[in-house]
Design a protein with these regions (language model features):
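Bacterial Sec-dependent N-terminal signal peptides
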Residues: 1-28
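Extracellular and organelle-lumenal recognition/adhesion modules and their flexible linkers in secreted
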Residues: 26-288, 306, 321-331, 338, ...
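Conserved, mostly hydrophobic/aromatic
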Residues: 47, 137, 232, 300, ...
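Solvent-exposed strand-to-loop "edge" motifs in beta-rich extracellular domains
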Residues: 138-143, 180-182, 541, 581-583, ...
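Carbohydrate-binding surface patches
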Residues: 164, 561-600, 606, 650-653
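Active-site groove signature of glycoside hydrolases
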Residues: 195, 209, 239-242, 313-314, ...
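Catalytic-core region of carbohydrate-active enzymes that cleave or remodel glycosidic bonds
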Residues: 390-393, 397-400, 418-421, 427-542, ...
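Solvent-exposed beta-hairpin/edge-strand motifs
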Residues: 595-621
Length: 657
């Protein structure tokens, strides 16, 4: 009897296994490859830059000297005196209206000895061995004869590079010198030593690596720009973000003060300087505007992205002062928008087109999009937006205007904004979502039922905010990236409504951050892509030209069995690209049938991004904990059999005829 029962149990177990695997084998997906639903905008996946987390000065901008023109609130911040064997002193002089954008300079007095200033850089200076570095200084000779010695030293004070300057003029003159380093330093310092007897006036003390992006003198940090270029973004939104608004209107971002000669750009305090308490406060966080609107346009052109500038609409940050410009005093703000279009697109014979040409770019930048306000809300915003719209539509109807739906993805402010914008000329409405990973999974169908005839959506700032630990990069977990991937299948599936999308924020220095998670982390010498970065890259590098449907049992797959799907046809490359997210903790198998097309090869490729640990993350020391792996797959007829690993993003590419 026991043997019989045992055989029955064994048979039932085997039958269950057969039924289980048969059920797995019966999971089928159909991709309607010959029935494009909607075009995918070339701007679909882009990047959003804001000068937060030392993303510009100390980051993307390759300048190594902090407070190079003595314009911080404390003019000697970042500098310390070096006294050797004698007397010397530094006097900060403010020349006021003589040079209002850069009024301060330092008068260095030396008394028969060596006296100097040492600059600490941005959490130190990252120096690479055997590389050329370019030093420059604006100087005017006073009494006596002064020579200048320039030294780079490492954290222990050892000299790793040096040069010198002499024969200064009695007029303000830029002097330059270059040298090659003998060692690497993560936290180097620059020493500027003055020798002789007398005094000399100095300003704009600067040090750049020779190797910048495209080797432009005094340009951008090459490795950080390369991370952006590798994303192949369709657009770049700049310069923010909350710095567009400022804590008060006086501190707002004004693009006209960021163009022209570097020494004539007016530095201001970065609003993230005072936004958070210790340890995230940053009293040394200012904006030199070495990256200004010209450099942003140039960067967009370099990486093949549409420029999307955002302008202040006469409102300061509503989370801070919330002050607004009176409606009868809004004209200067509107004029800034009109002048920006002229700067970007105008002929060289126009006032602002000539400024662009004089900076080295006579050809227009072909600006097509313009954002009015960053993250504003309520009646005061809509009233001001409409004033911009009236003027811009009349004079530049070719420009697509971007309005704000406020800081939240739902609620009374959000609903009010959308109600008002549906009767406007806004081409895109900027929606922001900083939410939990669970929210992103739940909202993968958010745009399935949006109005197809209303303004289009710009998913301008989003990031899943989940678990973290004490490690700086730990907020960027695989679970948060996986949630974003699931949500992005919904954005792609609704590409007729969603025309732009960008993760935020973009950059963060590991020792100088105010906000996390962030897409790309860096220190003075290294950079690392987060799991979220590789999700963005897999979508942006596989954008396609037209949306096609992925169906299971005739229905869209958006959360059933924790699977999320979208697909595109790329008419340019002749490929079908299928994106599948398995958010479950177990593997899942599918048979995928491509309907209406013939496959060009008997193999497909699949890129898989996954981790067995939902809360794993990449760090500067372990950069590929979560990293895409590419493999080939077999094809049988028009079918592909695929096994999706647990907690994975899978991108399948098939060549078609």
């Amino acid at each position: 009897m026991k043997n019989r029962n045992s055989k029955i149990c064994t048979s039932l177990f085997v039958l269950c296994l057969i039924m289980h695997f048969a059920a797995l084998a019966q999971k089928k997906l159909t991709v309607l490859a010959n029935k494009p639903v909607a075009p995918v905008a070339p701007t679909m996946w882009g990047v959003f830059f804001e000068d937060i987390n030392f993303g510009a000065d100390g980051g993307l901008y390759a300048e190594l000297v902090k407070n190079r023109s003595f314009e911080f609130l404390n003019p000697m911040m970042g500098w310390k005196e070096l006294k050797q064997n004698g007397k010397g002193k530094t006097l900060i002089i403010n020349r006021g209206n003589e040079k209002p954008a850069n009024p301060r300079f330092a008068r260095i007095t030396v008394d028969s000895a060596q006296y100097g200033l040492s600059n600490e850089g941005f959490r130190g200076m990252g120096i690479q061995k055997g590389k050329q570095y370019n030093f420059s200084i604006l100087a005017k000779k006073g009494d006596g004869n002064i020579n200048v010695m320039i030294e780079l030293v490492n954290a222990t004070g050892k000299k790793i590079g040096s040069t010198s300057l002499s024969n200064f003029s009695g007029e303000w003159t830029k002097q330059t010198a270059s040298f090659t380093t003998t060692d690497t330093a993560v936290k180097g310092r620059l020493n500027v030593l003055f020798e002789g007897n007398g005094f000399i006036d100095v300003d704009m003390i600067s040090l750049f690596p020779q190797e910048t992006w495209k080797n432009r003198p005094n340009g951008l940090r090459a490795d950080l720009v390369q991370m952006l270029a590798d994303l192949k973004p369709g657009f770049i939104r700049f310069p923010g973000g909350c710095i567009v608004e400022g804590r008060e209107l006086q501190n707002r971002y004004q693009w006209k003060t960021t163009v022209g000669p570097i020494e004539d750009r007016m530095s201001i305090m970065n609003r993230w300087n005072v936004e958070f308490r210790a340890p995230r406060n940053a009293p040394d966080y200012f904006q030199s505007f070495g990256i200004g609107f010209y450099e942003y346009f140039q960067l967009a052109e370099d990486i093949g992205a549409e420029p999307l500038p955002i302008l202040n609409c006469g409102m300061a940050c509503q989370y801070n002062t919330g002050e607004v410009a009176q409606m009868d005093q809004l004209d200067p703000y509107v004029q800034d928008a009109l002048d920006l279009i002229e700067f970007a697109n105008g002929a060289v014979t126009t006032k602002w087109g000539k400024v662009r040409a004089d900076m080295g770019h006579p050809a227009p930048f072909n600006l097509k999009y313009l954002g009015i306000g960053n993250e504003q809300w309520d009646e005061q915003y809509i009233e001001r937006y409409k004033e911009f719209e009236k003027n811009l539509q009349q004079k530049h109807p070719e420009i697509v205007l971007v309005g704000s739906a406020g800081p939240s993805p739902n609620g009374p402010r959000f609903d009010y904004a959308w109600k008002e914008f549906k009767g406007s000329k806004a081409g895109l409405i900027d929606e922001h979502y900083y939410q939990s990973p669970e929210w992103f999974f739940k909202n993968a169908t958010r745009y399935d039922n949006y109005d197809r005839k209303g303004p289009k959506v710009f998913a301008g700032e989003y990031a899943a905010h989940g678990k973290d630990d004490t490690v700086t990069e730990s907020k960027n977990t695989w679970f948060s990236a996986l949630a974003e991937a699931a949500f992005m299948t919904g954005l792609e599936r609704n590409a007729d409504v969603v025309k732009m999308a960008s993760y935020a924020p973009l950059f963060a220095h590991v020792e100088a951050w105010q906000w996390r998670p962030d897409l790309i982390w860096f220190d003075n010498l290294r950079t690392v892509g987060t799991p979220n970065y590789y999700v963005q890259k897999l979508f942006a590098n596989n954008k396609g030209t037209h949306v096609i449907q992925v169906l299971q049992d005739g229905k869209v797959l958006a959360g059933k069995d924790s699977i999320y799907a979208s697909a595109v046809l790329d008419k340019t490359s002749g490929e079908v690209i299928i994106k599948l997210v398995n958010a479950a903790t177990a593997p899942t198998s599918y048979e995928i049938s491509l309907a209406g097309v013939k496959l060009n090869k008997n193999r497909a490729t699949i890129e898989v991004l996954t981790s067995p640990d939902a809360y794993a993350y990449n760090t500067l020391d372990q950069q590929k904990n979560i990293y895409p792996v590419q493999k080939t797959m077999g094809i049988k007829g028009n079918n592909i059999n695929v096994s999706l690993p647990p907690m994975s993003l899978n991108v399948i590419k098939v060549s078609i005829r």
